[in-house]
Amino acid sequence: MESTEPTAPTGPAEFTAEEAVPVLRVEDAAAVVAWYGRLGFVRQWEHRFEPGFPAFVEVARGGVRLFLSEHTGDARPGTLVHLRVRDVDPVASEFGVRVEDAPWAREVELRDPDGNRLRIGTPTE
């Protein structure tokens, strides 16, 4: 008789891809895509199972990708994502916020239209 007990891992799993893409819960994907456009993100694709169903959208800026989901079970509102940028000052200027100087970075914190938090910073030397 074969055992159905799970086996203990023998080591790290092998992966060929090494990328984490955060999923952010949104109510109105089109409005949020426009908001992320102010940060230089561009809509890559959108999926709906059928017309009128919730949207699942990818936005990207360079090598950074985010998934925006109208599906209630995919993520919780208020998620925090930290983005590193070369220069945080243009972001602060675009959104009319003040840059905070911390020992590890110069940062701003923004909230998208659904309350997801983006901490955007330039690391200090």
Language model segments and positions:
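Vicinal oxygen chelate
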Residues: E18-E27, V57-E58, H71-V97, W104-R111, ...
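Conserved acetyl-CoA-binding loop of GNAT-fold acetyltransferases
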Residues: G37-Q44, V97
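N-terminal beta-strand motif that seeds the catalytic metal site of vicinal oxygen chelate
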Residues: M1-A31, V81, T124-E125
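Residues embedded in well-ordered secondary-structure elements
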Residues: G11-A13, R48, V99
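Short beta->alpha transition motifs characteristic of CBS
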Residues: V23-R25, W45, D101-P103, I120-E125
